[in-house]
Amino acid sequence: MTQLHFDNRLRQQLPGYQEEGARRREVRAAWSAVMPTPVAAPYLIAHSAEMAHVLGLDASEVASAAFAQVFGGNALYPGMQPWAVNYGGHQFGHWAGQLGDGRAISLGEAIGIDGGRYELQLKGAGPTPYSRGADGRAVLRSSIREFLCSESMHHLGVPTTRALSLVGTGDAVVRDMFYDGRPQREPGAIVCRVAPSFIRFGNFELPSARGDNALLRQWVDFTIARDFPELVGTAEALYADWFAQVCQRTAVMVAHWMRVGFVHGVMNTDNMSILGLTIDYGPYGWVDDYDPDWTPNTTDAQGRRYRFGTQPQVAYWNLGRLAQAMAPLFADQAPLQQGLNRFRDTYLACDRRDTAAKLGLAECRDEDLELIDALRALMRDAEMDMTLTFRGLIDLSPVHPDPAQLHDAFYDDHKRVASASQLQEWLQRYAARLQQDALSPDERRALMRLANPRYVLRNYLAQQAIDQAEQGDPSGVQELLEVMRRPYDDQSGRAAFAARRPEWARDRAGCSMLSCSS
């Protein structure tokens, strides 16, 4: 039998409801006990070998029928004590009240072989007290996307939750994918998400909004003690240091999003991790042809609140809501503003660091920010692929910069021809800057290869894997996972995974924009 050691501190140290299964309109506690709802025939589709290793699970254990039973929601390992957490949140800028884990059930906090804490959470394992009438299930397509993106982001170096397993349930789930009144039966699945903590901004917002300062303080004290043990101090000074840390980590996370071209799609405060991890992979996407106004979320198509270019500002706004929630614990609000200033300072520093790395420079001067902004404007106007453009600059000659290096980045030949002189002018500016820089050509290329991925999880690649899996063939999911394990390497025989979005995928559902239906 698999031996995992569990230390379920959240359930032990925060107030909750011990009785299982009861649905409540309003919950005045941190968590509720709940059991996963069994499924018909759980089977393993894919898993992360790295994550399994950290947890001390070997290949034979992962391949066992018992593993599929546990991570399909039909059984528990010793020490597991399932629960769902209560939280609120601001959604699309408006307070939404109590939300909670509507279809996420935490099995326990496992201690890995590295001594780290890893909360194991099933997404799609049935209803919880916070499901608000929903079935608590998830479909295969959204589960594949979450599984692949969790691991892809990790290997890109982006702070993120992880994924241990993707399990098919053998049951159908009814969903209206486009919210057009035409629901369909789809195959069900369950992802086991993994993180040191799944605590969100909304865990603090809800008790604060209700005036429950005692529970608010319990949440803060618990989070600092368990997840920020390096922080020391008392009372407001400790809380201020903690809030500044949250702001700093959030800035680092969002800067990485902007570096690799990731668009989260639903940056509600209930989808913001207190650890600065990317969490809740729904209608996300990667920027193909560069457009700062692009969002992959059909729900946000009108207002585009969560579009690519505004993600740093939205993160700052969300932190403002967290500061607002924390205000009852402070006699003086100045430390909260100082924390918000930490976000701005950290983000600007990360942006300069990433600008230098993406362009292959030893340092980022003020004029380099203008240089990269000019490139972004060119990419937008000429419909150039963001990933391919930056990757194409790696082998550019500083002596004779050749625009042909970037031909594959264009989506429209007419725009390529029309922008030729503008591109040549920019390349000359860039080449001149490289000749002034302290890095050798080899150092420059090495730096750029670590900042500019060759492979990203483009929506059309994920959709192709989904199409295969829905026909009973999981090999596409497994191969895509393998490719995304080495996103910065040139992988032999896998050029197709680095290609720009094909024309057939420009407007296809799942390849361009997605709904929140999952």
Curated annotation (Swiss-Prot):
The keyword Nucleotidyltransferase applies. ATP binds at G100, G102, R103, K123, D135, G136, R193, R200, D280. InterPro entries: SelO. It comes from the Bacteria. Mg(2+) binds at N271, D280. Keywords: ATP-binding, Magnesium, Manganese, Metal-binding, Nucleotide-binding, Nucleotidyltransferase, Transferase. Pfam families: SelO (PF02696). Its EC number is 2.7.7.-, 2.7.7.108. Belongs to the SELO family. Nucleotidyltransferase involved in the post-translational modification of proteins. It can catalyze the addition of adenosine monophosphate (AMP) or uridine monophosphate (UMP) to a protein, resulting in modifications known as AMPylation and UMPylation. This is Protein nucleotidyltransferase YdiU. It comes from Xanthomonas oryzae pv. oryzae (strain KACC10331 / KXO85). The lineage of its organism: Bacteria, Pseudomonadati, Pseudomonadota, Gammaproteobacteria, Lysobacterales.
